[in-house]
Each structure stands twice: as structure tokens, then as C-alpha cells.
Amino acid sequence: MTKSYSESGLMGEPQPQGPPSWTDECLSSQDEEHEADKKEDELEAMNAEEDSLRNGGEEEEEDEDLEEEEEEEEEEEDQKPKRRGPKKKKMTKARLERFKLRRMKANARERNRMHGLNAALDNLRKVVPCYSKTQKLSKIETLRLAKNYIWALSEILRSGKSPDLVSFVQTLCKGLSQPTTNLVAGCLQLNPRTFLPEQNPDMPPHLPTASASFPVHPYSYQSPGLPSPPYGTMDSSHVFHVKPPPHAYSAALEPFFESPLTDCTSPSFDGPLSPPLSINGNFSFKHEPSAEFEKNYAFTMHYPAATLAGPQSHGSIFSSGAAAPRCEIPIDNIMSFDSHSHHERVMSAQLNAIFHD
């Protein structure tokens, strides 16, 4: 009889080992691959760390370099301002010539403009009521006087009445300097102290002004509708020949004469004038007597200038007593000669009173 497998004792006895099977080979190969992959990963990680360290150092160096460059640029900007706009081109000969030509044209335009302005101001100085052969008004004074003159004329046209000379001059001299005011007053034959009392606080208040002592009469000029002399249409030297009517001072001179004064008929303009005389600030002009007047009124007696100074000079004239000749001056003839000014008439009245005493 045959033995069974269990009985043969195979279960208890070790079996001899045979050659490795294909599964073992597969497992061993997989383990090797895993180990190789791990090594490669470790190498890659080490290389990556080394690369990162290297790159980090380079980046830090680059950052430091950039910071240093920025600091240097900021320092340069602080030292030198940054120029804006187009860069300066190189100056060539052609550009220099064009530049000089443009500059010459601009200078010529400015010169012509100033010449035209000065010519217009000269024409304006001839029109405004202020004339002087020795003094020239400044530009600002000329413009101010012209503005006041236009304002005064517009007020006259608006009111339609003949203006008062004092108020007219006050309007003209508003805002002007004292020298210009004196020139305007001299051209209109007025004393600036009479119509500008507020500028002279030392002037006594009891002294009357020109408008209070002598009635102001408007002058009659050839130009109709204008209250001031026609400075633009007439020669400036003729302005000073204009005289007020003789009856303007008759009320003030009547106490010096025995009979009332009569009006004198004479032309509005007289002959040539001698240089002006200044009496108490008033501008008056001495007329040169003609040859006929010298023949008709030739005085044979010559009196010293001190005879008009005071009463102590009277003895030198009348020292001979009753034997001295009495000289009477024909007042009517003198008053009929209209070339005498106000102060000359007063002097003749005083002489007549002395001779009649």
C-alpha cells in the first residue's frame, strides 16, 4: 500500500530552497528604483538649496548696488537742479545772425513806440492850460492835468453855465504837485495862495482872497464855447497878452480917486511884452511903452526910487518948501492907456495923493 502525503512527514521536515522566483526579482528591482529615486531627489534638493543660496547672495548684491546708485543720483540732483525742456542747441553763425536781427527789429519797434508816446505827450502839453518855456511837465503830471482839464470841461458842458475862475482853477489843480499848480496859476494870472488856502496854514484868516476882494469876470476869448484860452489854435505867447476888463478893479480903486473910474476901450491884445515881473506871487507883465507915448508923456523930473518907500523920503522932494513946483499927473490919460496893470495903477494913485497933499 502507498503512503499518504501527510504521513510522509513532509510537513515537519524543512524543504530544500530552490532558485528565486520572478516575484522576488520584481520586488528587489522595485526597491532599487525607490532608493535611486530617493537619492536623486536628495541631490536635486541639495542642488536647489545651493542655487537658492547663490541666487540670494547675488540678488542682495544687486539690491545694494541699486540702492547705492539711487543715493548717488539723489545727491547729484540735490547739487544740480534738473533742467527741463528742450536741450540747448549749439549756436551757429546763422543762428547768431538771426538772433541779432530779431533783437534789432525789437529794439526799433520799442524805439518807435517811445518816440510816438513822447510826441503825443508833447502835443498834449500844448493843449493843457499850462505853459512854461523853462520847465517841462513830467509825463504823470501832464496826464493828471489833462484828466482834470477834461473833467472841468465836461462839468461846464453838463451845467451849461459860465464857470467861476477860482473853482475852475481848483478843479484843474486837483491832485497836482505844487510846482505844477504854480505853473497853472501863473498861466491864468492868479496867485496860488488865493485859491488854495488850505495849502498855506500860515496865511492869516482875515486876509481876503482874490475872489472876495476883486470880482472875477470870465475872460472873453476868440474860441466860442471854451472857458479856457485856445492853447491849441493860438500861439502860446499870445496867452499872456489877454487882460481882464478894466472895470474888474474899479470897485477896489475908487477910494484912491476923486471921481469914479470910467471904462476904458482898448483891444484885447497889446504889443510885445517885456520879461514878467513877480509882485507878491502874482505874475504880471510889464508893457514896453511905444514911441508916441514917450513923446506925449515925457517927464522932465527924475525921482529916486526911495520916494515910494516911506514918508522919510518926502523931505528930499519937497525940501524947498512952497517954491517947489507941484507936479500933477493926468490920471485920465494914464487910465485911458490900458497897458498899465493893477499894481501900476495903485502906484500912480499913491503918487497923486502925495503930490496933492
UniProtKB/Swiss-Prot annotation:
Efficient DNA-binding requires dimerization with another bHLH protein. Heterodimer with TCF3/E47; the heterodimer is inhibited in presence of ID2, but not NR0B2, to E-box element. Interacts with EP300; the interaction is inhibited by NR0B2. Interacts with RREB1. Interacts with ATOH8. This is Neurogenic differentiation factor 1. Residues 81-93 have a biased composition (Basic residues). GO terms for biological process: amacrine cell differentiation; anterior/posterior pattern specification; camera-type eye development; cell fate commitment; cell surface receptor signaling pathway via JAK-STAT; cerebellum development; dentate gyrus development; embryonic organ morphogenesis. GO terms for molecular function: chromatin binding; DNA binding; DNA-binding transcription activator activity, RNA polymerase II-specific; E-box binding; protein heterodimerization activity; RNA polymerase II cis-regulatory region sequence-specific DNA binding; RNA polymerase II-specific DNA-binding transcription factor binding; sequence-specific DNA binding. The modification Phosphoserine is found at S162, S259, S266, S274, S336. In islet cells, phosphorylated on Ser-274 upon glucose stimulation; which may be required for nuclear localization. In activated neurons, phosphorylated on Ser-336; which promotes dendritic growth. Phosphorylated by MAPK1; phosphorylation regulates heterodimerization and DNA-binding activities. Phosphorylation on Ser-266 and Ser-274 increases transactivation on the insulin promoter in glucose-stimulated insulinoma cells. Residues 58-78 have a biased composition (Acidic residues). Its main location: cytoplasm. Coiled coil: none annotated. Expressed in pancreatic beta cells, pulmonary neuroendocrine cells and retinal interneurons amacrine cells (at protein level). Expressed in endocrine cells of the pancreas. Expressed in the inner layer of cerebellar external granular layer (EGL). Expressed in the Ammon's horn (AH), which includes the CA1-CA3 pyramidal layer and in granule cells of the dentate gyrus (DG). Expressed in photoreceptors of the outer nuclear layer (ONL), in a subset of cells in the lower half of the inner nuclear layer (INL), and in a subset of cells in the ganglion cell layer (GCL) of the retina. Residues 1-94 are annotated as: Disordered. Changing S162A: Reduces weakly phosphorylation. Reduces strongly phosphorylation. Induction: Up-regulated by NKX2-2 and NEUROG3. It is found in: Cytoplasm; Nucleus. Residues 101-153 form the bHLH domain.
